[in-house]
Amino acid sequence: MSETVRLTVGQAIIRFLVNQFVEADGESKRLIAGAMGIFGHGNVAGIGQALLQNELDATPDGGEMPYIMPRNEQGMVNAAAAFAKATNRQQTWMCTSSIGPGELNMVTGAAVATSNRLPVLLF
């Protein structure tokens, strides 16, 4: 019998995303290539702590999710959309910010991604 693994919601989300792959032309790639986030007072999902924990628990076989801290929420989503376009819509980045003005700034980038049919994952 296996031992129960206790995770927070944020840790479970990150662990799930790290294990999502897409296969095309016989090549397997991670669907969510990494995470970008600007953390402030209202990040309720616990994603920041989960990303740090994922980095600390990383194994040599590449089980970690890279994290970048951008300076602007709209630019962050636009960068994720550009990455999705560059990889032929087979990979994208996860974007997260605090609740409030930061989330609202992400909406414009999400509209651009939606109008161009580019995948981005927003938290």
Language-model features, listed with the residues they occupy:
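Hydrophobic or amphipathic alpha-helical targeting/insertion segments
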Residues: 92, 102-105, 109-123
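Thiamine diphosphate
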Residues: 1-102
